[in-house]
Amino acid sequence: MSRTIMAFDFGTKSIGSAIGQEITGTASPLKAFKANDGIPNWDDIEKQIKEWQPDLLVVGLPTDLHGKDLETITPRAKKFAKRLQGRYGLPVELHDERLSTSEARAELFSMGGYKALSKGNIDCQSAVVILESWFEALWGE
């Protein structure tokens, strides 16, 4: 059975999202949700979850380059993951998101130049990078 996985790139002003299929190991950007100090409009997230019906949620875990928690943002991303699990009853996994934004910027720039580098596009592409990295870790690549 192939699972549908939804990923989130947590931020205090914007939360990017992506969807992917475990069988293909690929992901596509969905929507960037505006956040107020890290708190999204939960109704918008619920609509997306109902539409796509994922089996699992993956939240990017922000750390420094050595894999250590960042003082302010890491605990907030963990709290966001716990809220997702509590609200929607879906399993949630945290996944290392180191350098995902840099990779997302590079991919977007190669596809559309500076015009493609909007905040929402970057956040959603970061969620794609996080999810595809999660797939690679799942398969041991």
UniProtKB/Swiss-Prot annotation:
Hydrolase recorded as keyword: yes
Compartments where found: Cytoplasm
Entry GO terms, CC: cytosol
GO molecular function, one term: nuclease activity
Any one Gene Ontology BP term: rRNA 5'-end processing
Keywords, sorted A to Z: Cytoplasm, Hydrolase, Nuclease, Ribosome biogenesis
Gene3D superfamilies, per database record: YqgF/RNase H-like domain (3.30.420.140)
E.C. code: 3.1.-.-
Disulfide bonds: none
Domain of life per record: Bacteria
SMART domains: YqgFc
Record-linked Pfam families: RuvX (PF03652)
InterPro entries: RNaseH-like_sf, YqgF, YqgF/RNaseH-like_dom, YqgF/RNaseH-like_dom_sf
Family as reported in the entry's similarity comment: Belongs to the YqgF nuclease family.
General function of this protein: Could be a nuclease involved in processing of the 5'-end of pre-16S rRNA.
Protein name, entry field: Putative pre-16S rRNA nuclease
Organism: Vibrio parahaemolyticus serotype O3:K6 (strain RIMD 2210633)
